[in-house]
C-alpha cells in the first residue's frame, strides 16, 4: 500500500498538471490522453494487487528433495561445467563481430555533431522504442534481477514497475518542453533556466552519474567473463570496453540506435526463450507456477525487515530517485527522444517503451531467477545454491549447446547497448557543456566531432578505472543500488523544482546540488545520519576501508538525500529574491502551454 499511496500521489499530481496545461480533458485529443494515462494506472494497479494479495494464496508445491544429476552438477559447479561449449563461444564471438560491423556500417555517413549526437533527428518511433529497451536492460540487469528473482521471486520486477507514477509528468509535461526547446543536453537546459554556474554543477552531477554507470556495466561484464572463462574481472571489463568504443567513436548515435534495435530484439527474444525452455523443462506453466513458493509470487516481498531488499528502500532508491534520473535526466535517454523525426514519433516511442516494452523487460531480466527458484523447489537444482549463480545455473541446465551461446550473446548485447548509449551521452555533455563553454568556445563542427570521438574513448577509460570501486560490493544489485542512491538525489530534486516551481531560484539550485552532494558524502562516513529517514530498515553491515559506510543504508540513502535536498531547496528559495526579469516560457511548466503548441 505504501508504494501505491506515495506513487498515486505523484500520479495524481501529474494528472492535475497535465489537465491545467491542456494535455488531458474531454476533447478528442485530451480525452484520448486521459484514457491512456488512466489505462496505464489501472493495468499496474490490478496486476500488482493480484500478485500481492491473491497469487500467494494459490496452491504451491512442497519442496522436493534435490536429485543430483551430471547436468545439475555441471550447472552449479564451475569446475564441472557451467561454462558452455565451443559452439557457444563461437556464437558469442560471432555476435561481437556482427555488432561491430553493424555499428560501423550504419555510422559510415556520419559527418557532423548533429549526426553523432542525434542521428540527424530522422528516426521513427518504433526504432527508438526498441533501441530504448536495449539501453534500459544493462548486462547488470540479467544478473542482478535473476539473483533477486531467486531470493525474492516476482518482487524483482519492482524496479521495472515503478514508472507508471511518472507517466503523465513525463509524457505531457516534460516531453513537450524538452522536444520544442531543442536543447542538446540536460546541463544546457539548466543553463537556460538559470545561469552558467548552475549549468556547471549540473554537468558535474550528470557526468559522475554516467561515468559511474559505465563502470557498473563493465564491472558486471567482467563478473560474467570471470564465471564463464575464469578471466580476471578487470581484464574482462577492459576487453568488452574496447569492443564497445570501437564502433561508438566511429558512428555515434546512428550506430547506437541501429545496433541497439538489433540488440533490443535479441534481448526480448532470448529472454522469452529462456522462460519458454524453463517452463517446458518443468512440464508446463502450471508446474512452474506451483513450484514458485507463495512469498515468491508477491510483487513487494518485505517492507523494511531485510536491508538487502526492502520494498520501501527500492521505492525511494529506484522509484523516486533513479526513475526520474533515467527517464527525465539521463542524457542517453534524452538523446533518443530528440532523435525522433517528429514530436508524434517521440511521444509514441515513450508510450511504447513504458507501457508495452518495460513490462516485457521485467519478465526478461528476472525470468532466469524465477526459473531457478522453481527448479530448486522441484528438486532439479539445489535449494541452497548461491543466488548470484542462479542465472548461470538455470540457463545452462535448460539449454543445449548453441542455445547457451545465444543467451551469452544476449548478455553481451545488454552490456554493449547500455555502454554505447552512455559513451555517446558523455561525449555530448562534454562537448556541449565543457569544451564549448570553457576550453574552446568558437570551435568548428568538425573540431567538435573530433572532440566527441576522443571523449568517447576517454569516458571508456574512466569507466574502466571505476571497476575496482564496484568490486568491493557483495553483489551487482548492491553495487548498482548504492551508486544510484548516492549520486542521483541532488540533480533530481533540482530538476523537479526547476521544472514545476517558477519561484525556484538559481541560488537555491546551486545550494541544492552542492549541499546535497556534501550531505550524501557525509553519510558515507556517518551512516547514522540516515537513521531518521530509514523507515525502520536495518543499517546493515559496513564494508571494508575508508568508504565502508557506503554499504550501509544503501537504498535508504536515497530517501535521506532527497529529503535533505528538498529542505535545502525550499529554504534557500524563500531566503532569496524571486528572479522575475527572465522569460521562462517553454522552460517550465505553465498553464495552457501544451494546448498552445497545437499537438495531440
Predicted regions and their residues:
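Cytosolic-side transmembrane helix boundary signature
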Residues: 12-30
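Membrane-embedded helix-loop-helix hairpins and adjacent transmembrane boundary segments
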Residues: 2-4, 13, 30, 34-38, ...
Amino acid at each position: 500500500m505504501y508504494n501505491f499511496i506515495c506513487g498515486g500521489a505523484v500520479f495524481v499530481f501529474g494528472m492535475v498538471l497535465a489537465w491545467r496545461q491542456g494535455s488531458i480533458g474531454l476533447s478528442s485529443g485530451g480525452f484520448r490522453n486521459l484514457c491512456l494515462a488512466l489505462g496505464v494506472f489501472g493495468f499496474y494497479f490490478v496486476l500488482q494487487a493480484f500478485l500481492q494479495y491473491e497469487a500467494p494464496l494459490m496452491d504451491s508445491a512442497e519442496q522436493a528433495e534435490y536429485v543430483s544429476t551430471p547436468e545439475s552438477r555441471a550447472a552449479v559447479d564451475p569446475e564441472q561445467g557451467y561454462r558452455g561449449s565451443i559452439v557457444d563461444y563461437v556464437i558469442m564471438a560471432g555476435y561481437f563481430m556482427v555488432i561491430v560491423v553493424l555499428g560501423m556500417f550504419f555510422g559510415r555517413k556520419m559527418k557532423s555533431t548533429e549526426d553523432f549526437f542525434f542521428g540527424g533527428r530522422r528516426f521513427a518511433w518504433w526504432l527508438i522504442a526498441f533501441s530504448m529497451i536495449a539501453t534500459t536492460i544493462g548486462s547488470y540487469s540479467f544478473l542482478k534481477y535473476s539473483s533477486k528473482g531467486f531470493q525474492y521471486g516476482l518482487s524483482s520486477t519492482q524496479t521495472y514497475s515503478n514508472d507508471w507514477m511518472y507517466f503523465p509528468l513525463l509524457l505531457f509535461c516534460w516531453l513537450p518542453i524538452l522536444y520544442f526547446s531543442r536543447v542538446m543536453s540536460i546541463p544546457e537546459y539548466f543553463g537556460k533556466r538559470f545561469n552558467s554556474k548552475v549549468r556547471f554543477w549540473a554537468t558535474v552531477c550528470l557526468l559522475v552519474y554516467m561515468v559511474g554507470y559505465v563502470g557498473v556495466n563493465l564491472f558486471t561484464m567482467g563478473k560474467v567473463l570471470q564465471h564463464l572463462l575464469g578471466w580476471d574481472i578487470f581484464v574482462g571489463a577492459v576487453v568488452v570496453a574496447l569492443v564497445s568504443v570501437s564502433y561508438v567513436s566511429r558512428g555515434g548515435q546512428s550506430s547506437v540506435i541501429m545496433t541497439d534495435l538489433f540488440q533490443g530484439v535479441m534481448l526480448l527474444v532470448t529472454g522469452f526463450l529462456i522462460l519458454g525452455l524453463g517452463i517446458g523443462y518443468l512440464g508446463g506453466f502450471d508446474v512452474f507456477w506451483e513450484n514458485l513458493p507463495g512469498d515468491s509470487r508477491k510483487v513487494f516481498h518485505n517492507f523494511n525487515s531485510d536491508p538487502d531488499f526492502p520494498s520501501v528502500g527500492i521505492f525511494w532508491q529506484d522509484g523516486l530517485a533513479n526513475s526520474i534520473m533515467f527517464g527525465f535526466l539521463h542524457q542517453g535517454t534524452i538523446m533518443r527522444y530528440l532523435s525522433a523525426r517528429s514530436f508524434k514519433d517521440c511521444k509514441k516511442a515513450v508510450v511504447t517503451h513504458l507501457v508495452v516494452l518495460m513490462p516485457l523487460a521485467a519478465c526478461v531480466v528476472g525470468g532466469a531467477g524465477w526459473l531457478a527458484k522453481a527448479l530448486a523447489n522441484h528438486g532439479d537444482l539445489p535449494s541452497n545454491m548461491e543466488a548470484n549463480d542462479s542465472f548461470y545455473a538455470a540457463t545452462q541446465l535448460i539449454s543445449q549447446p548453441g542455445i547457451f551461446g545465444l543467451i551469452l550473446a544476449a548478455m553481451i548485447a545488454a552490456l554493449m547497448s547500455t555502454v554505447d548509449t552512455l559513451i555517446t551521452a558523455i561525449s555530448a555533455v562534454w562537448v556541449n557543456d565543457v569544451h564549448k563553454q570553457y576550453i574552446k568556445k568558437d570551435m568548428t563542427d568538425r573540431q567538435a566531432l573530433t572532440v566527441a570521438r576522443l571523449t568517447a574513448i576517454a569516458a571508456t577509460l574512466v569507466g574502466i578505472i571505476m571497476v575496482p570501486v564496484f568490486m568491493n560490493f557483495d553483489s551487482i544489485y548492491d553495487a548498482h543500488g548504492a551508486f544510484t542512491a548516492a549520486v542521483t538525489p541532488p540533480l533530481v530534486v533540482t530538476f523537479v523544482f526547476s521544472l514545476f516551481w517558477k519561484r525556484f531560484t538559481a541560488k537555491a539550485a546551486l545550494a541544492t546540488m552542492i549541499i546535497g552532494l556534501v550531505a550524501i558524502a557525509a553519510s558515507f562516513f556517518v551512516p547514522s545520519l540516515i537513521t531518521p529517514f530509514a523507515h525502520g530498515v536495518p543499517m546493515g553491515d559496513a564494508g571494508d576501508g575508508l568508504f565502508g559506510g557506503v554499504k550501509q543504508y544503501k537504498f535508504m540513502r536515497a530517501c535521506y538525500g532527497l529529503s535533505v535536498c528538498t529542505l535545502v531547496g525550499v529554504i534557500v528559495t524563500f531566503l532569496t529574491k524571486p528572479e522575475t526579469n527572465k522569460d521562462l516560457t517553454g522552460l517550465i511548466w505553465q498553464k495552457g502551454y501544451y494546448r498552445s503548441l497545437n499537438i495531440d
